Amino acid sequence: MSDAAPAAWTMDSLMEAIRSSEEGDRIAVSASGGDVIVAAMRDYGDLTIYLSAGAEQIVVSTLLWPCDEQENADEFNRFILKAQKVVPLSNFAIADVDGREYYELIGELSSNSDIATILLELRVLAENAISAASELREAFAAG
């Protein structure tokens, strides 16, 4: 399969490209409801990453932990906004899931991105999520 991006990624073409890539045996992908792909990152403890592809961008995201489990949440929110500069290619957000708010890590890339770039984004998001769950929380607690 070519590394070039198709004219427009679809769920099927994106799943097939991930599966047939050199990393395909380390990323389990499946379709979820709507236009979302669920990727289990095997090298990262089966961390779940969600992918959606639109006309102009591909969004990848993962839930971190419930906001109500974060001590001093207001101070932590300010802390992660300041720490944003040291988290490459990812942005923090808060997502509502079934009435509960979760910290979320998001990456975005052009819909014209080739599969190698998409795979890089998946790896970086997984690494950043693990770092956020441990190192950033520890740095905040120590601060």
Segments (PLM) and residue ranges:
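Long, highly charged amphipathic alpha-helices
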Residues: S13, A17, E75, F79, ...
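Beta-strand-connecting loop/turn residues
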Residues: G34-D35, A55-E56, G99-E101
